């Protein structure tokens, strides 16, 4: 039985061998040449399978074919070949009609295995295994030069930067996908066109006018999930890809290079911390501050400790910071002065150790109290008999103790209630505003004011104004009471709402 070598080796000139069986006596030499070429091609494919960029499971679907398109096979229609009609594009037929293909589908490869990758095509820019294996730096440069119909190996052409990853569909007779790639899954991000591109290059904004290629190491779109490969190549190429994906679509949830720039900007920008300590022994009048600048808080604190605060030999612990509110009042101990200076410098050397909190404190006592919010510890119990309330710090307990004592200096003039804080009294006054009848009949209200005038007219600026009065009435009463005549208008009904 004779071999049908037409779909397999059209580049060898044997494409018409199986189509013309009445001339088979004239082609025995071609059969031998085809067998030798098949062995050589198999060796090339095996060497290609060892390439780190290609999965070995895909190698059955590829073969090197620098010649024209092949005829239709069981794996799907190829291109428009010499003897094969124009059929539907095969799963890995990577060449548009009329162009040479670097990879064509094998006739015997099952179509079901190729279906997941049927939407991806690559550039017809690799005409030999050497071009495919060792053309490492360009990636998509060949496709950009060849024209819009060709596609890059790892990056889409310039006209297909915004191709949507979900628009994969079944391709028909002359239709070619735009922006599809040969090896998906390297990085599931879009590369967007940038206004800073110039001749295929991106200005990185770094010293020395460093430029990076935008079409090199371009990020690709793919529905495949290959986290190991994506993470490996991202860590390898992301330093060369800074800022190239700033205009990526918002529905992608990947880490963008902007975070890297923000981190580097925070590390590179120097802070100017100025020492405002005024040396009391200087003879200048007015006295000038130190005004030394430092780039880190550690340098400023070290300078303050060595040059100004001094060691244990200092007997007077006075803060001489410019415009200090203490105005030369000394501290009893050096550590109190050190804690006070942090108010001026902004130093907060005590961070919260709990993960995700991020709070920092200037004093260790405040950190100790704060950590109780994480642990739930409440060591301070109410000292009133019968009360089991507990608190995280003593100040909260002290405020609570006013509930049990008579120390409530803020009295309500509308009733007999008293409060420990003026904010509580203001909140209570809203109750009287919502119930005007109760406020008029309150005994405290009648006893606190003259009977001839309403309670709200005695002190217009107080918080216990009559709620029945409109704002216009209050202003009118204020003007009348502050006038020289001291008489009130006779018609009060005009002031009520």
UniProtKB/Swiss-Prot annotation:
Keywords: Activator, Cytoplasm, Developmental protein, Differentiation, DNA-binding, Gastrulation, Metal-binding, Neurogenesis, Nucleus, Repeat, Repressor, Transcription, Transcription regulation, Zinc, Zinc-finger. Residues 58-107, 143-180, 423-473 are annotated as: Disordered. GO terms for biological process: anterior/posterior pattern specification; cell migration involved in gastrulation; central nervous system development; negative regulation of DNA-templated transcription; negative regulation of neurogenesis; negative regulation of transcription by RNA polymerase II; neural crest cell fate commitment; neural crest formation. Residues 97-107, 459-469 have a biased composition (Polar residues). Gene3D superfamilies: Classic Zinc Finger. One of its GO terms (cellular component) is nucleus. One of its GO terms (molecular function) is DNA-binding transcription factor activity. Belongs to the GLI C2H2-type zinc-finger protein family. The C2H2-type 3, 4 and 5 zinc finger domains are necessary for transcription activation. This is Zinc finger protein ZIC 2-B. It comes from Xenopus laevis (African clawed frog). The lineage of its organism: Eukaryota, Metazoa, Chordata, Craniata, Vertebrata. The gene is zic2-b.
């Amino acid at each position: 039985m004779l071999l049908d070598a037409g779909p397999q080796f059209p580049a060898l000139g044997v494409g018409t061998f199986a189509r013309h069986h009445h001339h088979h006596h004239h082609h025995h030499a071609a059969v031998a040449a085809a067998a030798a070429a098949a062995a050589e091609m198999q060796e090339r494919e095996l060497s290609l399978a060892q390439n780190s960029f290609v999965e070995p499971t895909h190698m059955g679907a590829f073969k090197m074919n620098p010649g024209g398109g092949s005829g239709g096979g069981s794996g799907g229609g190829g291109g428009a070949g010499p003897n094969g009609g124009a059929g539907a594009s095969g799963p890995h037929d990577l060449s548009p009609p009329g162009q040479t293909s670097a990879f064509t589908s094998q006739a015997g490869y099952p179509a079901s295995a190729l279906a997941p990758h049927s939407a991806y095509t690559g550039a017809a820019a690799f005409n030999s295994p050497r071009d495919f294996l060792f053309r490492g730096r360009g990636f998509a440069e060949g496709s950009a030069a060849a024209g819009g119909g060709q596609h890059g190996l790892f990056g889409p052409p310039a006209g297909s930067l915004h191709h949507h990853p979900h628009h994969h569909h079944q391709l028909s007779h002359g239709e070619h996908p735009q922006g599809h790639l040969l090896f998906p899954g390297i990085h599931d991000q879009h590369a967007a066109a940038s206004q800073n591109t110039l001749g295929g290059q991106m200005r990185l904004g770094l010293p020395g006018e460093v430029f990076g290629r935008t079409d090199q190491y371009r990020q690709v779109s793919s529905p495949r999930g290959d986290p190991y490969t994506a993470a490996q190549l991202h860590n390898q190429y992301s330093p060369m890809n800074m800022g190239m994906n700033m205009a990526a679509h918002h529905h992608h949830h990947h880490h963008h290079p902007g975070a890297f720039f923000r981190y580097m900007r925070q590390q590179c920008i120097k802070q100017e911390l100025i020492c405002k300590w005024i040396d009391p022994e200087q003879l200048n009048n007015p006295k000038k501050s130190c005004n030394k600048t430092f780039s880190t808080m550690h340098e400023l604190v070290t300078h303050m400790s060595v040059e100004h605060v001094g060691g244990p030999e200092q007997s007077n612990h006075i803060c001489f910071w410019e415009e200090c509110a203490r105005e030369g009042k000394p501290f009893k101990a050096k550590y109190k002065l050190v804690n006070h200076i942090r108010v001026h410098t902004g130093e907060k050397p005590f961070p919260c150790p709990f993960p995700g909190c991020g709070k920092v404190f200037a004093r260790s006592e405040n950190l100790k109290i704060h950590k109780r919010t994480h642990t739930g510890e409440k060591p301070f119990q109410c000292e009133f008999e019968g009360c089991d309330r507990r608190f995280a710090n003593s100040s909260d307990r002290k405020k609570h103790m006013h509930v049990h004592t008579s120390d409530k200096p803020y009295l309500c003039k509308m009733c007999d209630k008293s409060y420990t804080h003026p904010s509580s009294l203001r909140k209570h006054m809203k109750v009287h505003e919502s119930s005007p009848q109760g406020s008029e009949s309150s005994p405290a209200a009648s006893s606190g004011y003259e009977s001839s005038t309403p309670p709200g007219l005695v002190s217009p600026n107080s918080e216990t104004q009559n709620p029945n009065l409109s704002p216009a009435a209050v202003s009118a009463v204020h003007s009348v009471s502050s006038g020289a005549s001291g008489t009130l208008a006779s018609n009060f009904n005009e002031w009520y709402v």
